[in-house]
Amino acid sequence: MNDTILRHQRMLEKFPENELARFSLGKAWFDAGEHVKAKEQFEIALRKKPDWMVVQILIGKCDLSLGHREAAMAAFTRARQLAIDQHHDGPLAEMEQALGELNAGG
């Protein structure tokens, strides 16, 4: 386990209800390639804040890396709608590209 993960685990232990601490731990797991552990943290964060677009995108990326194509498509579709609702052009383009590639079988 790397120092970044340990630091974020300690922060979450101190502040278990802090969504940013939970997101940071999930992102540390994601960056370490531990997509199952990352997704667990992201799903908890998303339950507390269902409109968190970045978390929704990362859940889709976790699913994709784990070979869960249908789940990734569902996550990216939700993220696309959040990007539209929140007027985020960059993430919208990213989700449209990801969905296009998944629909094309890529």
What are the functions of these language-model segments?
Residues 14, 48, 82-86:
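Structural marker of alpha-solenoid helical repeat scaffolds
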